[in-house]
Amino acid sequence: MFTGIIRDKGKIISISEGDKSRRITMKTKIDLEPISIGASVACDGCCLTVVEKTQDTLTFDVGAETMDLTTLGDWEIDKCVNLETSLRMGDELGGHMVSGHVDGIAIVESVKPDGESWRFKIRVPDQFAQYISPKGSVALNGISLTVNEVEGAVFGVCIIPHTWDVTNIKSWDEGTRINLEVDQLARYVARILQK
């Protein structure tokens, strides 16, 4: 489990293409001492398993389904990736509960400055619109964000300077594809109401 509070922006330094898979290595400033082989790390919101590590790099294998359902198939060398290590007992629960199981790909519709902050409009696939509500939570590229307003399959978020600085959100432009994970509680409530 994760909280959507980004720990570092990793930088992809190598990608090895396999048969319907990729091996991705990224450099990070996270203290890797407590992270073991087999540990889970959220990479742009997608829970991946550490298969190799050095003092300052992590390596992950990415399968075909993950590449199909997320933006990971689009990644290239030098891409900046939001990283979050998994929760440990005693960690602060600062964002919201994030599983790292990406639901699909959302598209940035617009980015506008708003004083010291930025307003983003995000379009989600129609089947996920029912899980997005004002003042609810959503994870975009692994970042825990609060929904400001909703109109159909488009919703708005406001990005404060701190989030702008410590995540890869400043690289998002109109048309950027981003990983979407809807709030788990919203999903469960919708499921119960369907019965």
Regions found by a protein language model. Give the residues of each.
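Conserved loop->alpha-helix
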Residues: 1-195
